[in-house]
Amino acid sequence: RRLYSGPLLLTFMLTNQCVTHCKYCYADTSTQIKSPLTTQRMMELIKEASDLQVQQVNLIGGEIFLHKDWKIILKELVKRGIAPEFISTKMPVTQKLLQDVQETGYQGIVQISLDAIHSEILTASLGVNGNYAKEMLHGLQLLDDSGLNYQISSVLTNYNCQMNVLAELLHELSHLKHIRDWRIIPASNSIYKEYNVFSHLKPTKAQITKVFNQIRPLLTQVSFPVILGKEVTDKNYQDTWGGSRCFKGSECSA
């Protein structure tokens, strides 16, 4: 007998539009959406999800803050107690955006995706203008002063897999007083990118191990946790003898 009468979690992709053009993008940002769900239909689906006792509805993009009614949608999720655990954005934060988020009553985590503070690196890897880094750092300070929960996430590629690049970003983050944590995650394959192109973006296992070992001594100097994504260097799959009974990964919950 199944324990649940409906899904535990739903995900709404509000838009596939974005403010960046990341070389490693994991989203389908090229498909032209001819008939997007209306906000009214989304509200109906949110009610259905609530009635089915869905525990959480995630919001993803593209950039969710580019959807014209993101505030209405998020506020409804908050009201029904099924808001996402975190919302991820690469958009430079403004005071108006923070005010809008606060007005929804959202108590989850705002995840800021920032891979470096070098304008040249960000322009090459994200396709942004030369002011992007400055705008992101200004937005981080506003976010730090806002009282909202937030964390930083960086995708590790051949553009930023260098000790000096990560150390400079860490130095900037160390000035923030309320940061929850910083996550450094090596890039993984994207189904929307040609593998022979994408493979050039991915740092090798040796590169990742080296830069993690180099930066680890600096992590004791900051007051917030820094989470190093070691799945690539410490993977268990394809390394196990004895079949599935000896597999060190998670058990199937079906």
What are these regions (language model features)?
Residues 113-115, 119-253:
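Radical SAM enzyme [4Fe-4S]-AdoMet core and its adjacent flexible, acidic
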Residues 1-108:
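Conserved alpha-helical substructure of the radical SAM core
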